[in-house]
Amino acid sequence: ADITANNNREWFLAHKEEYTACRASFEEGITKLITVISQFDPTIAHLTVKDCTYRFNRDTRFSPDKSPYKNHLGAYICMNGRKSLCGGYYIHIEKGHTLVAIGAYFLPTNILTACRNEIMGNIDEWRSRVENKAFVETFGTPNASKWGDENPKGFGLECLKTCPKDFPRDYEHMNYLKMKDYCAWIKVPDTFFEG
């Protein structure tokens, strides 16, 4: 049995030792990952595991789903920690739905507009990064797909249906401006972080 089938306080308290051991192992792995990533991205070298990991309890105040706990463990590794709007590295560990992601999502309008302007101003460099063979084979093309069993990889979680406000409607590479996030992800085996 796991938290997905038993998402209630009584079950959780009866299995708290298992959670504590699992959480400790997860945090140890994230600490190692920070060390590895900091070798090619020194902006995150100062982070601690607490800067990056999310709480296991859910905020249910405005949700119709009152399940008290998340079904996964997650960490966002970026220069300003898990609450940052900067791009970074996301780790999501959930039975049958483990994945790794890069980029940024849930961006406020002003930052999303700045990203779109930056892409337009540097479209050749942008395309050389997101249209190269290795990137496309790993993550795909902009597709606004939710992660799940049917989507083992993706580039972009949400896209606008039309041109964003104040951008030219006839822009040749509109698919990049319609993106509401710049997040690329790939599903990995649940055992990916073991060992």
Model regions and ranges:
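Active-site acidic/histidine clusters and adjacent loop/turn architecture
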Residues: T4-Y54
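N-terminal start-of-chain detector that recognizes signal peptides
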Residues: F26-E28, H46-V49, F62-P64, K153-E158
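Hydrophobic/aromatic-rich structural module bridging two neighboring secondary-structure elements via a short loop
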Residues: S38-G88
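Charged, low-complexity intrinsically disordered regions
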Residues: G87-G195
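Short, charged low-complexity intrinsically disordered segments located at boundaries
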Residues: E27-L33, T60-Y69, K146-D149, K165-F167, ...
